[in-house]
Amino acid sequence: MTFRLRREALRTILTSDRCVNPGSVYDAISIRIAEDLGFPLGMFGGSAASLAILGDPDIALITLTELAEQMRRMSRAAVLPVLVDADHGYGNAMNVRRTVQELEAAGAAGLTIEDTSLPQAYGAAKPQLISLDEGVGKVKAALDGRGDSSLVILGRTGAVSITSLDDAIARARVYETCGVDGLFFTGITTRDQLDAIAAATNLPIVLGGAPEEMSDLGYLASRRVRIALQGHAPIAAATQAVYDTLKALRDGVSPKQLKGLPSAELTSRVMREADVKKRLRDFLGLGS
């Protein structure tokens, strides 16, 4: 599947009348598993990227180059469309434009640009937002940096939890007028908040996490939410699995006695071993 077809698949999700949960992906293995399990979309979150690439918390230490290279690896490994958390665009509006170009070239189906002030300023104990004017400049730069018109660009705001619901709505409405393809909200904790946002805006909504009582996909779809994130449990589970395995080996457990290891069939499938063997036969004359 070409990059453009992946982007069109994401657009189909946004223009549908239903809400989907994306699979949280962060490397070649996780995206292949998500694809094999039938997820319609992958979400490459900033926190998952920071942990997978740097082993660090999500405090804006990762660089654009590192993020784009990881996206490129995933694009090679699978054809699942991926929505990328591009954080603040790694600088000012000009940096945002470059960010869009690099992630587009890496095969992202879509990306989000947020209005949080990053990296965290000296002495700022709580998250802060950039001004609306700066946010507009970043959104416009993102749209200008898009070479493929099918690339999805979402305006993202965390104003609900940082400033106010009214500010979140005001920012979202302005981002809509700039021409973004959808709106990404974090910090929504009640149905009343989502109801107000849905009533005041027009574009498809992406929900960056919400309480369990807001997980009903039917309700979310009725409020124009088309994508609802479920956090990034896969990388957390993988971290625990690696820890448990290494600890067991350190404590003297035999490799054959380890629990939780994948079957040979699953490992072969994730590695796309059948495809590789066919190419070895076709191109190198190896095997029967």
From Swiss-Prot:
GO terms for molecular function: magnesium ion binding; methylisocitrate lyase activity; oxaloacetate decarboxylase activity. It catalyses: oxaloacetate + H(+) = pyruvate + CO2. Disulfide bonds: none annotated. One of its GO terms (biological process) is pyruvate biosynthetic process. Transmembrane segments: none annotated. Keywords: Decarboxylase, Lyase, Magnesium, Metal-binding. Its cofactor is Mg(2+). Substrate binds at S47, R156, H232. InterPro entries: ICL/PEPM, Oxaloacetate_deCOase_bac, Pyrv/PenolPyrv_kinase-like_dom, Pyrv_kinase-like_dom_sf. It is an enzyme of class 4 (lyase). Binds 1 Mg(2+) ion per subunit. Its EC number is 4.1.1.112. Homotetramer; dimer of dimers. Belongs to the isocitrate lyase/PEP mutase superfamily. Oxaloacetate decarboxylase family. Catalyzes the decarboxylation of oxaloacetate into pyruvate. Seems to play a role in maintaining cellular concentrations of bicarbonate and pyruvate. HAMAP family: OadC. This is Oxaloacetate decarboxylase. It comes from Bradyrhizobium sp. (strain ORS 278).
